[in-house]
Amino acid sequence: MSRSAAWMFRRAPRRSSFNILVSTLLAATVLAGCAMSPPSGGQGSAPYAPRVVRVVAGENVWGSIAAQIGGAHAAVTSIIASPQTDPHAYEPTAADARRLADAQVAVMNGVGYDPWMNRLLAAAGGSRTVLDVGELVGVAPGGNPHLWYSPGYVAQFTRAIANAMARVDPADRAYFLRRQAHFDNVALASYNEVIARIRARYAGRPVGGSESVVVYLCGALGLHLVTPPTFLRAVTQGTDVSAADKVTIDAQIRNRAIDVYLENVQNSTPDVQAQVAAARAAHIPVVAMSETLRPAGATFQAWQTAQLRALASALETTHA
């Protein structure tokens, strides 16, 4: 496998059904957009100034942040919003196409994670601000796409989404920037505190993982992820894992060479399930991680902080 393809996902949406879907919707969407257009002015009519920015995010991890920063001056919709949805294999719906065609700001994860967003944007036509998080943070296609597990990337996104909404609604620029500062310094306070605490107490401790979703987080926490990278990539891609990697991981678990096992519960293969069972049998704590908000109505910071606290508790247990 070439290095550039190392993180590419395992299933692509079915283009034929998607193209049929979009072709049947575009004319209706354009007409609907015309019907929603503001008055053109004239005697007795007030000049139109957009005060609610329409934002569509591919994933609710980014949509949650956008909604909190946008506040009363943003209407944010997330396409993938259910913990039961596999983001890697998602296929857009008619409603997704309509929402994106009407959006003033579109947010996509990029890095090959949501290629269906590119097709929706191409079909939507019109003009809008598109915020590709992968491009924003400098992770090229073929890199690890689980960007929301990097605190540094999250910080870059909060600034970018505030500025994107301010470009659409410049009259409320100060409002968006105030809310961004509040999100960074207040809403994320517990999240940042737990990250700092884990790093201070447990940096360098060995952990295992089921999939590449844990890579950025382990780096931020200073934890030593000892699972073979080739295994993490294979599970992410949905390709066969090597026998050598399975032997290595089985030995790590059997010898209690890891303090915690981090499981991506949205991509749990038979190999991963066997490792989880073995870890529990060896009294190694298993901590659940996910790719979308859990529960679905949680905020980004509540979801991440809950996972981090579970990890901190597991690490404390192994060092009691």
Outline where the language-model segments fall.
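N-terminal secretory signal peptides that target proteins for export/translocation
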Residues: 1-15
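Extracytoplasmic metal-acquisition and chelation regions
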Residues: 23, 34-320
